[in-house]
Amino acid sequence: MNKIAYKIYAVLKNLICSVLFFAILFGTLAFIAPLFRYEEDEISTGNLSTFYAARKESVDVVFLGASSVYRFFMPTVMYEKYGITSLNYSSAGMAGEAMTGLIDEIIDVQNPKLIVVELRDYIKWTGRVKEEDYDKDKWYEAQYSYISRIVNNMPVSKNRAKVIHDTVPSLLGDDELDWQFEFLKTHNNWKDISFSDFLSFARKELSGEKEVINLNGKYKGADYKGNLAVSSVDYNESVDWSDFTETKEIEPERLEVLDSLINKAKSVDTEILFLTTPYPETETLAVYENFVQNYLEENGVNFFNCNKKVKEIGIDFASDFYDKKHTNVKGAVKVTEYVGKYLVDKYNLEKSNLTEEEQKEWQSAADKWNKEVLEPGVKKIEETVSKHKAKGSTNY
């Protein structure tokens, strides 16, 4: 071998070794990075882990969105009433910017017959006051938490990378590098990780084992396929926007988010339905919701506005909510049953094709939830309302 050939060989050898070294290094860091993630709230972690623990193609419908999903849709109610399996891919404050990547994630992981995308949180941040009128620190802190609750519970994938790309620069104004290579952001947590934690993590990752994560036993949906219902009650004035047609156009930058969702819905084979759940809406938001409905329908995309159907659903604003935005167990059952029937009829959904073991698992979760949450919850709500009436309250 002459000197020139030897030099070329040496350079190529060093280059290949360097590439292999960094490939192994980054591969190892990517593999162990989830071990160092911050613990997030039990609802987001529980909801998303419930989704990932399900056998692929065992779920007919996935509801995507913020708390306006997990406080309104009860999977076991849908199963008992219609024989349809559903799960909630939801976390508090989920931004519309995250949803295109999450639609791909849901299809890749579960491939359901239908994805229902709830848009109330998207509309909530539409038409608000200018950014300079907000407390920027509080805005940053809130959005940081909302994004973390999603991506910290996702496996490393192109879809996770897209969610980060679509949210971190636009909502936080941050460089996405630390989020994409999350070891840069979380490596300081090493001191909280024990060797047994590492062994347990490695065993689960290498085996492909998936389970519902119940942080400190606080995730109340762990035994109920993600059902998260509250048994308290808060009085709200009755509202009815069924005949209200006024609209107000949303800002261009928010319209871009909606356009991306429309394009995504049209580009996938999976059926996509956009929806808003019912609540004591104000006129300030109703005009934007009407605009969004018209815009989606004009673009050939399906939209179901529950705020136009409160009478049909049977919503009682005085006793079906536990705060101004979310249904309690009594209201959640009403919404689940009504929307469930709409989905079954519109999309010709048939009973789920489950294994015998899965059928027993779903029925067991339904029975357990009915006994431990639904029955005592409705009873507690009715007793609370009765006490208010006995005290002379005119609200009930």
How would you label these PLM feature ranges?
Residues 93-97, 248-254, 280-287:
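Acidic-and-aromatic substrate-binding clefts and catalytic sites of carbohydrate-active enzymes
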Residues 1-12:
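N-terminal Lys/Arg-rich, disordered targeting/topogenic segments
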Residues 33-57:
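Alpha-helical transmembrane signal-anchor/signal-peptide segments
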Residues 10-34:
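Hydrophobic membrane-insertion alpha-helices, especially the h-region
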Residues 64, 68-157:
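Membrane-embedded segments
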Residues 136-268, 356-396:
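Secreted/periplasmic serine-hydrolase-like ester/acetyl group-modifying domain
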Residues 58-72, 326-329:
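Catalytic nucleophile-elbow at a beta strand-turn-alpha helix junction centered on a G-D-S/GDSL motif
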Residues 284-367, 371-391:
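C-terminal regions of proteins
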